[in-house]
């Protein structure tokens, strides 16, 4: 189902388990990154399961930990959609500095019917903010109070800590493009 593919992707990326990527992506899949911020870097395109896994799991996992990504919508249970798009939010820490990163944007998925896997994922990163390690308790207290990995923008905004640095994220969630 669409839901299980999306869940397997987070098992791979958030939990640093590369073997899960083969349950989410077809061997010839394409990843496209649309960055609307300079705060994080990714190659604009990755072609094939190995390259996508390297970009989204192995290299990502070398740089970040405590990764919690949330889908801000949920596909119907037990359906196999040909495409699916939704907003997302992520919170994580930089291994090297302890700084906290919070970002948000949009996923646009395209799937093949058999075996049911993603053939394309476009990740748009609308904003990514960096907060000092001293804000980690407030940020992760907020994120860990959410239902993982499915929530909605209203719940995210309602529980957001009053940190000025989070304003761009909250603004996007209140007024997605």
Can you describe what each PLM-predicted range is?
Residues 1-7, 11, 91-177:
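Terminal "cap-and-tail" regions of soluble proteins that handle hydrophobic small molecules
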């Amino acid at each position: 189902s669409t839901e299980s593919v999306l869940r397997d992707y987070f098992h791979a990326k958030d939990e640093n388990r590369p073997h899960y990527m083969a349950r989410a992506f077809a061997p010839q899949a394409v990843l496209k990154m649309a960055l609307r911020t300079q705060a994080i870097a990714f190659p604009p395109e990755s072609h094939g399961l190995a390259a996508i896994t390297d970009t989204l799991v192995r290299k990502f996992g070398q740089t970040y930990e405590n990764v919690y990504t949330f889908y801000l919508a949920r596909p119907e249970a037990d359906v196999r959609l040909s495409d699916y798009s939704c907003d997302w939010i992520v919170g994580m820490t930089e291994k090297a500095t302890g700084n906290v990163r919070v970002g948000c944007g949009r996923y646009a998925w395209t799937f093949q019917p058999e075996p049911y896997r993603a053939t394309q994922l476009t990740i748009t990163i609308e904003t990514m903010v960096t907060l000092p390690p001293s804000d980690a308790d407030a940020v992760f207290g907020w994120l860990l109070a959410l239902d993982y990995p499915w929530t909605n923008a209203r719940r995210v905004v309602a529980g957001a800590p009053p940190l000025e640095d989070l304003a761009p994220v909250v603004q996007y969630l209140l007024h997605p493009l």
